[in-house]
Amino acid sequence: MSVLSDADVRQYLAKGEIQIEPFEESSLTPNGYDVSIEEVLVPSTRQKATGGVAQIPPTTRFVVSTRERVRLGRHVAGQIWLRTTWARRGVIASFGMIDAGFSGTLTFGAFNASGDPIEIPIGDRFAQIAFLTLDSPASETYDQRSGTYQDQKGVTLGRP
């Protein structure tokens, strides 16, 4: 496996092995792509923000969905990283891999570990995807194996 550079990502986009909608050149990084916030949900209060600014109380769990819809081919996976801007404000988040064959918006679980409220503007960049090439194509892609969250849109909480 190797991480794709910005030039590689452009080539994979042109070939259709990676799709990002909407795609913004300014979100492309030297080794990935920054995804932005479409929706924030605070499950404990059922507070949902789809515009303006989400207010996250101290020591509170929240869930973020991306504006971008991502689709990966058989040869590509994605690794998600929290932007350090948020980590420096006290946000902790848990991410997994984006499997080859996945299609949909992304949902992230996060936690305001600080003792202060945090404001999260809808539309701000929240995480980066580092795209990885697989040494060989996946024999079964995400949609063929489980596909639990295939084609999800918006905040999608855990499914059994």
Predicted regions mapped to residue ranges:
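DUTPase catalytic domain/fold
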Residues: 1-160
